[in-house]
Each structure stands twice: as C-alpha cells, then as structure tokens.
C-alpha cells in the first residue's frame, strides 16, 4: 500500500491509495515532532505501507525542506520514501471545500481535513509521475 503525507508545523495530512482509489485519512495533530513521528511510524506499520510519498515545496523554501527532511528521518520506516513537489497542493485542496460554509471551512482547516486533502493532491501527483514513467 502507498501512503502520502503533507507535513506541516501543526498537522500532518494523510492520504492512502487503496485499490486504485486515493482516500484522505485522519490527519495527525502535532503536539511535538517526536509524538508526530511516532504516530506516523505506527500508522505506517499498522497499514503495512511499502511506499511513503512526502510532499516538499520547491527549492526556494530551503528551511521548510530541511524541516520536512529532518522530520522524515525521525520516522521509523524501512520502505521506499519518495519526495514529490507539493506546490499549490493546499490551494487545490481548499478549492475542494467550496461547498462548505465559512464555519465548516474553518473547522476543516483546524481539524486537519484540509491537510489530508492536500496529501491526496500529493498522492495524485505521485501516481501521475509513476504512470508517465511507465
């Protein structure tokens, strides 16, 4: 199974590829990086993940890239790790919330649903890249 994550300072959005369908999963709410890396490690183990797709912004965001790479090194995972450009994934995910009212949009941002929808966009990009290369 393949899992994607959108690593943020407060939340980690999670999406999985199940039988060819990309689904958002419950986001990991970060209290600190050790707790968050432990929670992600547990999820990877529970779901028997073989490939972890991680969103990273373009090179002009050096601090963010370094923070994401450091966090991923804390994760206990022996499978394949693939970094995919995440530019605009949160904006694209937010556009999928147009049907929600203002209050529900705010809740979707706070509870991590937006982050997991962003992880779905990252996983879509990974799938497109894999298909293009085959």
UniProtKB/Swiss-Prot annotation:
Q: Which InterPro entries match?
A: RNaseH-like_sf, YqgF, YqgF/RNaseH-like_dom, YqgF/RNaseH-like_dom_sf
Gene Ontology biological process terms from the UniProt entry: rRNA 5'-end processing
Main location class: cytoplasm
User: Would the keyword Ion transport turn up in this protein's UniProt record?
Assistant: no
Where does the record say this protein resides?
Answer: Cytoplasm
Q: What class of enzyme is it?
A: hydrolase
A GO cellular-component term linked to this record: cytosol
Query: What keywords are assigned to this protein?
Result: Cytoplasm, Hydrolase, Nuclease, Ribosome biogenesis
**UniProt EC number:** 3.1.-.-
Query: What domain of life is recorded for the organism?
Result: Bacteria
**Which Gene3D superfamilies does its entry note?**
YqgF/RNase H-like domain
Molecular function terms, GO-annotated: nuclease activity
Q: Which NCBIfam families match?
A: PRK00109.2-2 (NF001026), RNAse_H_YqgF (TIGR00250)
PANTHER family assigned to the protein according to its UniProt record, in alphabetical order: POLYNUCLEOTIDYL TRANSFERASE, RIBONUCLEASE H-LIKE SUPERFAMILY PROTEIN
Tell me, in a sentence or two, what this protein's role is. Answer: Could be a nuclease involved in processing of the 5'-end of pre-16S rRNA.
Q: Which family does it belong to?
A: Belongs to the YqgF nuclease family.
Full protein name = Putative pre-16S rRNA nuclease
What organism is the protein native to?
Helicobacter pylori (strain HPAG1)
